[in-house]
């Protein structure tokens, strides 16, 4: 019997069905224009772009221009790439233009889909950013789709780390710009450390199309982008604390695997206190609960987390004496990416690796808040429906499931649940042997390096040739993925999420052609391609006859979305395929979420060793467990966002203020207002309202005026005059300080003084903002404990961070006024010293930004510039004079190797 909800859907259709139905008339309009646009010459396509641009600038809506723009873009794609967009691809493009997430399955041509809304929205002249997860994809897509945009008379740019300034500026000024999420975020932070408006890369945030949107906006959401500088080295403390931790027993701490949290018990605190005192790390008589113990307690807690929550070869690997993190979602290494708050140092101490010093934050932003800067945001992915609530609540994005061009022919089987992990892996190997014997390609998905290598050993023992794709084999990634769909191929892979390369049945024909050309460079490329394509077609047919790609997963992930991504590797473009999850009661997800109950059921059923339970009910209960984990992770991300929103409001105020200062030629009025507010504060402090003259602290005011305003005026005598009140003294101070600053401007020249005011303002804002970020970090780390006193940590954080922000503004006014009052003409020697100091500071900031971005990009792709060797200047290309030197010194090229040029 049908439920009411199911019955209603049958009658009225789902919301998704209605959205699809609404686009069909628009798609019909585009198709009706196809013949007309096919008659246009190549120049005619570009002229059409000019016409559409003019109509957009004259006020015609983009929705009205959409059919013609999409028809023009489709024709350009046919001519430039030989690819004609399907109706489903046009639908995906329409949903992207409307500011939605288009869920399109693997192999449905998302890269081409992005060209349609990108072209339409670029007609306004405000630029479009197409965002990818790594540099390889950004460069590949910009080069590939750039041909379509060139045929339409539009410019395309690509952003990459270490790019020369002039090249990067030109890329941002292109109609369509391809970039990684990391590079965009770091450029935004860098822009807000610049001194001139002309140096700013990102002039506006108009429209962004985010590829693999779930990976960027959800998996990466809690990871802030940070530009940082070195702090004090405390490696001895980490080593000393690490030596204590192996002596802990199980009753000294409580481990909660569900929430990934570990805390000391009362017995643990007593044990620690005694040990810390005995080793001289805690003064005699001082308790761990005393405010003075905050730092030591923080380091001890991080040490405990390093030992109990972070596992080698699952969360990180140790390579060449360095701790390298592993991305839990993609299984990729993240060289240079470091955990914050001393946690990374605690892991380094645990592994006896070299302990790198902690860093101080110079600027930071989360992807959640960066991408919400855009006027319009959209995204593409193969798996978004399970996270639709989060996309709607945090980003205001709807999710639309776009139908596939051909029906999915893949078979998704029910999970097979075994009692033990050994039984599960044995069953996987047996099934792999059967598939391998008939030539069916097999992809074995695992959740950690350790498990992938264990499966590899089992396959080797059985004499089955195979490839392993995990963080250790990162360099061979593209080649391994390209071969995974070949006849008889067996591939073991840690999380396949976001790999960016399709597994094509019969292998990747383009890669085969390139390999054949490399082996036989004298051959005719056309003949060679034809021969390879014929061989590929034959091999593909053999794979299809064997049943297509067989995906076996060794564990359910915490997120259904990652499971769906793994399933989606099979059955692309209507190909046949098969997927099954092999599980055991010893798996993390099963163990944490109620495997005891299932174990009793299996015992009651009298299951024998090696037998599996296969039933849709098991799938349902597992999906409920996953939904619980997803819900908890969503709540955690929401909570992080609530706190980051507080800082984000302040960040926007400061960054907007910087932009205004850079854009304003004459800041003398701003500086004068600041000076007057400082004088108001001095009067209120030393001559409080509603007090008599004999209660005024005139000596204190006299000293403060000299210190803050740089003028020596007879304040004490003024105060002694008959009938003088605080307002009179305020006016006299405003006039005296104004006259003093005008005389300075006359000495320096008005233009020089205006430049000095701008530089002092910008430098002071930057230094005060850095101090403020540190205070907010400290506040954030302790405010959670207010919950024990029945006070809401978020409200406490809002209140105190606002007070800190008010303090920042007061301190900013005071410092700017004080510094400008002390400005004087420098001798030539002093000028030389100051220039050297400024150059060193600028180099340090640039080096910090470059290191941070290199770290992030290494995490995303590990791609290096082809042929680039750091020690070989002949491989550097043509660096601009103001770029950082490619040798890695951190100096500008003109001050390093460029001096020799």
Curated annotation (Swiss-Prot):
Amino-acid positions noted as binding Zn(2+) in the UniProt annotation, renumbered to this chain: 885, 887, 896-897
EC number annotated for this UniProt entry: 7.4.2.8
Membrane topology summary: Peripheral membrane protein
GO cellular component: cell envelope Sec protein transport complex; cytosol; plasma membrane
Chain residues that bind ATP: 89, 107-111, 502
SUPFAM superfamilies, per the entry: Helical scaffold and wing domains of SecA, P-loop containing nucleoside triphosphate hydrolases, Pre-protein crosslinking domain of SecA
Ranges for region Disordered: 856-875
Cofactor(s) needed: Zn(2+)
Keywords of this entry: ATP-binding, Cell inner membrane, Cell membrane, Cytoplasm, Membrane, Metal-binding, Nucleotide-binding, Protein transport, Translocase, Translocation, Transport, Zinc
Note describing how the cofactor binds: May bind 1 zinc ion per subunit.
SS bond partners: none
Reaction(s) catalysed by this chain's protein: ATP + H2O + cellular proteinSide 1 = ADP + phosphate + cellular proteinSide 2
Localization per Swiss-Prot or TrEMBL: Cell inner membrane; Cytoplasm
Database matches in Gene3D superfamilies: Helical scaffold and wing domains of SecA, P-loop containing nucleotide triphosphate hydrolases, SecA, preprotein cross-linking domain
GO molecular function: ATP binding; metal ion binding; protein-exporting ATPase activity
GO biological process, alphabetically ordered: intracellular protein transmembrane transport; protein import; protein targeting; protein transport by the Sec complex
HAMAP family in the record: SecA
Stated role: Part of the Sec protein translocase complex. Interacts with the SecYEG preprotein conducting channel. Has a central role in coupling the hydrolysis of ATP to the transfer of proteins into and across the cell membrane, serving both as a receptor for the preprotein-SecB complex and as an ATP-driven molecular motor driving the stepwise translocation of polypeptide chains across the membrane.
Assembly description: Monomer and homodimer. Part of the essential Sec protein translocation apparatus which comprises SecA, SecYEG and auxiliary proteins SecDF-YajC and YidC.
Entry's family note: Belongs to the SecA family.
Protein's name in the database: Protein translocase subunit SecA 1
Source organism: Ruegeria pomeroyi (strain ATCC 700808 / DSM 15171 / DSS-3)
